[in-house]
């Protein structure tokens, strides 16, 4: 694709265009402490195109011209390998290291957006739940989370479960363990990464964003309950 045509993919006056939304959302997430120190990432899939933030840049300073565009579908991007692009930024940037993991959300959940944060609440949850799953029940904010991230809304009476996978030195190497966790916990709306953060997806960017917010609230609440010696799952027997 010619450079001028490729740049047209990220040029729009529409504030809801993915190339405009991603910088706006990254600034918002930065203020929440989710993507500081260049960490974290976000992607938005619209039809046959995937818009992805760059890696290793200050997320609060991302501009639309920094956005990568990839075709979808394509073979799931493998860690540390080249992949097909519709557009690369002119400057020397690299696409998000989260890209293979974002593809998990597309291929396994048909998600329209996936968000990765380095939230301290998420990290603390992985430390206080040493097992393979985070659990919490009877919290109003559970109603803001959907079955599998893309299905029906959960109920106040449901017990929310989110799998926890072990971290790896390189982000891309989490791809397979994340996919395994998604298959083992098909009702989960995200995957926690121990001592690292969380991946959350949704049908579109709005649902991915609101579910990330709800889950972050639940991580914080769960951590506070654990530290106060309170059970996070009520026994109704």
From Swiss-Prot:
GO annotations of cellular component type: cytoplasm
Binding site for substrate: 98
An individual GO BP term: L-methionine salvage from methylthioadenosine
One of the record's GO molecular function terms: methylthioribulose 1-phosphate dehydratase activity
Compartment(s) of residence: Cytoplasm
Main localization (coarse): cytoplasm
Cofactor note: Binds 1 zinc ion per subunit.
Binding site for Zn(2+): 116, 118, 196
Keyword terms, alphabetized: Amino-acid biosynthesis, Cytoplasm, Lyase, Metal-binding, Methionine biosynthesis, Zinc
Superkingdom of origin: Eukaryota
Entry EC number(s): 4.2.1.109
Needed cofactors: Zn(2+)
A Pfam family reported for this protein in Swiss-Prot or TrEMBL: Aldolase_II
SMART domains: Aldolase_II
Catalysis performed (reactions): 5-(methylsulfanyl)-D-ribulose 1-phosphate = 5-methylsulfanyl-2,3-dioxopentyl phosphate + H2O
Function, as annotated: Catalyzes the dehydration of methylthioribulose-1-phosphate (MTRu-1-P) into 2,3-diketo-5-methylthiopentyl-1-phosphate (DK-MTP-1-P).
Family: Belongs to the aldolase class II family. MtnB subfamily.
Protein name per Swiss-Prot or TrEMBL: Methylthioribulose-1-phosphate dehydratase
